[in-house]
Amino acid sequence: HLCDRRQRQMCIRDSYGTAHVYRSSMNAIIAFNGSRNLSFKKVNQEFLKSFETYLREKDCSWNTVSTYMRTLRAVYNRAVDRRMASYIPHHFRYVYTGTRADRKRALEKEDMERLMKELPKQIHQGREELQRTRAYFFLMFMLRGMPFVDLAYLKKQDMVGNVLTYRRRKTGRLLTVTLLPETMKLIKKYMNTDSASPYLFPILTGGESTEATYREYQIALRNFNYQLLLLKQVLALTSDLSSYAAKHHTISI
């Protein structure tokens, strides 16, 4: 299967996030098709439109629909290049392959102010993970809306004095941030105490470029978002609180 082969290639090149997208997309296509055996001849515009309708009926967001369609389009185009499928101009024209904001991700000002206050003792007592989650969220906010993936993979060596230099996981772009005193204080409070670990925070334990570590990151991300959901509930916030909110709140300021 071309998609399976592409997934293995991504793993070999350490693109585990991309391989995860291909795997999720392929699973959705197989579920819709009812079989792993899918000929490229069957992938006509009627098939694509039906697949789009199927995804929406499964409550997939438009951005998820777009991700799956763009993945299928990439697989189809590779098949065309290898003369395994026919070239059809604008083959994916009538299905959604764009991006849209399905919901408002930036926090309301009142919610941000509530988050900035120390958690009431009756809330955080015995719930260190909730405190740590709140701290990570603020660090992401103060570090120019840093994505959770970059926070998780930060190394101790990335911080020299009050300067943090790191490379974006998604784009490879090198970024330098001068840390404010309050940011430094928060980092020192929650940084990794394991001297043998290269990571700045105790989020990951495995080697940087292994599939096991990527899976560990996926689990950490799900737990982080779950803890943020708990924070929203205990603080009675009106805004949606997720790993994206710190980034989008930074952009909206």
Spans of model-derived segments:
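N-terminal DNA-binding recognition helix of tyrosine site-specific recombinases/integrases
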Residues: 28-32, 41-43, 57-91, 144
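A Lys/Arg-rich helix-loop hairpin that forms a DNA/phosphate-binding surface
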Residues: 17-20, 33-53, 243
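Conserved tyrosine-mediated DNA breakage-rejoining catalytic core shared by Y-recombinases
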Residues: 93, 153-189
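C-terminal catalytic core of tyrosine-transesterase DNA break-rejoin enzymes
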Residues: 138, 142, 146-149, 247-253
